[in-house]
């Protein structure tokens, strides 16, 4: 996974649960199957958190939870600004053959206000349409290209059409108030055995420990 996308994923996952310890982040990301769609090596998650701390985008708090030492992470203002910038770029950059940045941004869409999500979807749709127009212009001179190259171009156009349909539908859903975005009351409840319940209790305890200094 590219460094920028790793930063986006780790910053976003910390923002969801902060304060949160490294084991919890690792477990949560693996429950998202990031090792498959994002090609994240589970062992790299801890080093990624350390790297972001060194960049000043995360703050590490070394606490004693009961009798157990634990390191928990929160995002800094620098980290939140970096997340917002990278999220917007990932949403608006169209690369049909390498959509990982876009997919990463979608996984973290609930961390973004509704108006900003709507703007990013509109910008991506405009960028996609511009790319299709360029591709159509290039196809006008492909009559002498090998057949398999023209077949590849047909595949790209098909991918673009499928994504365009999805973008239009999702844009309509966002404007209609659907989906759960930043600052809104969730419309779903996790299962009783969801680890998030334990993480929420840990979060409250970590906040108290941090406040004590």
Where does each model-flagged region fall?
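Amphipathic alpha-helical dimerization/coiled-coil segments
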Residues: 84-133
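Non-transmembrane amphipathic alpha-helical segments
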Residues: 121, 128-139, 160, 167
């Amino acid at each position: 996974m590219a460094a920028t996308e790793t930063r986006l994923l780790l910053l976003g996952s910390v923002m969801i649960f902060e304060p949160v310890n490294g084991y919890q982040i690792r477990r949560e990301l693996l429950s998202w199957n990031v090792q498959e769609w994002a090609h994240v090596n589970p062992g790299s998650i801890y080093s990624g958190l350390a790297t972001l701390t060194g960049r000043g985008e995360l703050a590490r708090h070394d606490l004693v939870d009961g009798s157990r030492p634990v390191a928990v992470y929160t995002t800094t203002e620098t980290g939140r600004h970096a997340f917002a910038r990278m999220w917007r770029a990932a949403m608006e950059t169209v690369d049909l053959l390498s959509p990982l940045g876009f997919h990463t941004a979608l996984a973290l869409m609930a961390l973004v206000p509704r108006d900003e999500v709507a703007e990013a979807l509109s910008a991506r749709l405009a960028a996609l349409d511009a790319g299709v127009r360029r591709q159509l212009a290039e196809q006008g001179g492909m009559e002498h290209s090998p057949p398999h190259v023209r077949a590849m171009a047909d595949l790209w156009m098909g991918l673009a059409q499928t994504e365009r349909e999805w973008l239009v539908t999702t844009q309509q859903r966002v404007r209609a108030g659907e989906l759960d975005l930043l600052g809104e009351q969730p419309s779903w409840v996790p299962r009783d055995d969801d680890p998030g319940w334990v993480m929420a209790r840990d979060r409250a305890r970590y906040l108290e420990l941090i406040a004590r200094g």
